[in-house]
């Protein structure tokens, strides 16, 4: 599936989910091991982070709810990084410049990765943005969130606390 087709689907379906209350689900299935790019252009595989609790968030500069969720996820990262949380914000912009402009306006400490071809959201079954996946230390997707509203922060904190306490 080409990136333009994925973006068309996300633009059509995404706003419906993104502006309403977020949808949360609890599941347990292995995380797809897809390759993404670092800011320097190096390739990393998501499985490289196995052994940590991971929050993977798919976002784009044009996604209105992402402008609110991105800083909130950075706060979560700062609050839980010493307990083993890694936040991976996977940008899906086709033009890297668009992401760079967004990132300059939103200082952050979380890890930003890039997937302009849209392989990783397809592997995760992303249906709207932002979409987040909480992964346990064994590499299993345990919780998913589609969309974003401020009231979801308590859910994130509860789920992260649960996962970081598991050994």
Can you describe what each PLM-predicted range is?
Residues 55-57, 87-89, 133-134:
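Hydrophobic beta-strand core positions in alpha/beta domains
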Residues 58-75:
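Conserved redox-active cysteine motifs that mediate thiol-disulfide chemistry
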Residues 101-109, 116-161:
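Thiol/disulfide oxidoreductase modules built on the thioredoxin-like
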Residues 47-63:
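Short active-site neighborhood of thiol/selenol oxidoreductases, capturing the structured segment around
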Residues 85-96, 108-117:
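Thiol-based oxidoreductase modules, predominantly thioredoxin-like and allied folds used
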Residues 21-47:
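N-terminal "domain-start" segment that seeds a small globular fold
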Residues 8-18:
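Bacterial N-terminal signal peptides
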Residues 1-6:
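Positively charged n-region of N-terminal signal peptides that target proteins for export
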